[in-house]
């Protein structure tokens, strides 16, 4: 609707919109000023992510909440590879299924230099993915890396401790 042309924040938590819902948001000519998009628990899959990463509706996005959806390593890789989120400060993918492949895609992406908060809890990420994220040079502003509820072990703890004690 043209009445939404100045809309900056959308919160559609728990509406089970599915791929058609995100498709509508991605393709709307009236949502080009979005700064916050909260789509928790909406059964969003990689099909939606594929549309999202080519849409110019998200270039002003600062907060993207896609937690508790159906995003796999392929969807995470698509998100990591797009340069259409230059202002993104918060990315929440908690409780998806991105695994180590998705974590590695984010760790090697140069597209999130402004990111401050990254939530990847409950994503089946192991030490391999977690250590790579912790040691990544591509998150210069990161303040929070949430890896809760993943099967992590000593290697992750040691990597985090090593990074936190550099220069001391």
Regions found by a protein language model. Give the residues of each.
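Ampipathic, surface-exposed secondary-structure segments
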Residues: 92-123, 132
């Amino acid at each position: 609707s043209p009445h939404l042309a100045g809309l900056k924040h959308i919160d559609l938590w728990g509406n089970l919109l599915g791929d058609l819902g995100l498709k509508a948001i991605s393709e709307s000519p009236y949502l080009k000023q979005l700064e916050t998009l909260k789509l928790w628990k909406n059964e969003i899959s990689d099909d939606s992510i594929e549309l999202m990463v080519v849409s110019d509706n998200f270039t002003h996005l600062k907060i993207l909440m896609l937690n508790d959806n159906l995003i796999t390593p392929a969807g995470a890789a698509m998100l990591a590879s797009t340069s259409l989120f230059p202002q993104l400060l918060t990315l929440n993918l908690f409780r998806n299924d991105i695994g180590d492949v998705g974590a590695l895609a984010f760790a090697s992406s140069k597209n999130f230099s402004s990111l401050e908060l990254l939530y990847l809890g409950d994503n089946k990420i192991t030490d391999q993915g977690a250590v790579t994220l912790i040691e990544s040079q591509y998150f210069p502003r990161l303040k929070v890396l949430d890896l809760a509820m993943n099967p992590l072990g000593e290697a992750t703890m040691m990597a985090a401790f090593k990074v936190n004690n550099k220069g001391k």
